[in-house]
Design a protein with these regions (language model features):
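Mature catalytic core of soluble alpha/beta enzymes
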Residues: 2-377
């Protein structure tokens, strides 16, 4: 399963072609795997560069990178594309060294080992956002579930359904409200551990957009383990077309529940099909998105959650949060906080829901409901 997700993260086909959403053709579409946008359509016209330069003559560069325990692809277009790709790769590697729980000398591993520590600016920014999301989502996003993820084997690959008493004991120690943060210093409660993996790739892609600005690129796109973020438009001035993997056909990497067209946006998806194991004794499937309130895989009635935002870190954190919260709570959350993001959801009945500002940029062969401030239609 891990290998399949890695392959999907590399599936970037950037030529401009037509596609019927839900079909098996992936031509012209960036695959988003579970991994406000309403103004993106304004960028659909030609860019100043594309008016005067043949798009096929614009220099390009790309790199495939393994970091944060996943495969990543960076593709840049512009005169300084090679420099931008090199700078992006260096930034990815720097943040991987800082944040990876798989590296004993990373900052996060040190904090978990010592129970406290001084945070770098990057870590402090992510922890601050994680605590905000913990508060606004009612605990659906919680960086302190790391010991539970470890207990289930999702951090080691040694999968097992945990003993109920052991799980209950660990669950009692979880809760971001038990963390103490004072300026750049963090202190964990007894038995706690943190993992920023739920927002780290989104934070990273956001940083890459800032790097691309420095190199005055015509356009760029990154896929960090299936988390996609686009810089500006394609070289011909058209929008990037992102195909959201169909959770009802996860084995087929080019089957989409729909296609969303964006510029200068992150498109990040969470789904139960990403990482899971089957218990040999019972035949039951357990996925990796844990409900922080129960310690068990979330059962929210959703199969897939995609968040579209200019803020990669926000999109990353909310894709997980909304999966845990379910349809109704996610819709209400968007109504209260949705100035900076939009949602595309699929429920277990195979019906798709999209927030109103994004509806004009999203196409699907599935039945689509629109989430508005007034309700769901």
């Amino acid at each position: 399963m891990k290998r399949k997700c890695m392959i999907l993260a590399l599936c970037l086909i950037l030529a401009a072609c037509s596609l019927q959403p839900g079909s098996n053709s992936s031509a012209g579409v960036i695959t988003v795997s579970g991994g406000g946008a309403g103004e993106a359509a304004e960028s659909a016209g030609e860019t100043e560069t594309s008016k005067t330069v043949d798009p096929s003559q614009i220099p390009s560069a790309s790199a495939d990178i393994f970091a944060m325990d996943t495969y990543m692809t960076v593709t840049c277009y512009g005169k300084r594309a090679e420099e931008a790709v090199a700078a992006a790769q260096a930034e990815i590697e720097r943040l991987d060294d800082l944040l990876s729980i798989g590296k004993a000398e990373s900052e996060i591993s040190r904090i978990n080992r010592d129970g406290s520590g001084v945070m770098s600016e990057d870590t402090n920014t992510m922890v601050t956002e994680a605590l905000r999301l913990y508060d606004t989502t009612g605990g659906a996003f919680d960086i302190t579930v790391y010991p539970l993820m470890d207990l289930w084997g999702f951090t080691t690959g040694k999968f097992a359904v945990p003993d109920a008493q052991e799980l209950s004991a660990l669950l009692a120690q979880c809760g971001s409200d038990k963390l103490t943060v004072n300026g750049d210093t963090i202190m964990l409660a007894e038995g706690q551990g943190i993992d920023l993996g739920g927002i780290a790739k989104g934070y990273t892609s956001g940083h890459l957009m800032e790097i691309f600005e420095e190199y005055d690129l015509v356009g760029a796109v990154v896929s960090l383990g299936g988390n996609v973020q686009c810089y500006r438009t394609k070289t011909d001035g058209s929008l990037w077309r992102c195909g959201i993997q169909d959770p009802q056909d996860p084995e087929n990497g080019s089957a989409y529940l729909g296609v969303v067209s964006v510029a200068d946006r992150a498109v990040i998806t969470s789904g139960a099909y990403e990482r899971y194991f089957v218990d040999e004794a019972t035949g039951k499937t357990y996925h990796h998105i844990l409900d922080p309130k129960t310690g068990y895989p979330a059962e929210s009635g959703l199969l897939s959650v995609t968040v579209v935002s200019t803020d990669g870190m926000l999109a990353d954190g909310l894709s997980t949060s909304c999966y845990v919260m379910g349809l109704e709570q996610s819709a209400e959350y968007w109504r209260n906080y949705g100035a900076d993001f939009d949602l595309i959801l699929m429920d277990e009945n195979g019906e798709v829901y999209v927030t109103e500002p994004l509806s004009g940029q999203f196409t699907s062969d599935y039945k689509v409901h629109v989430i508005s401030q007034e309700g769901i239609s």
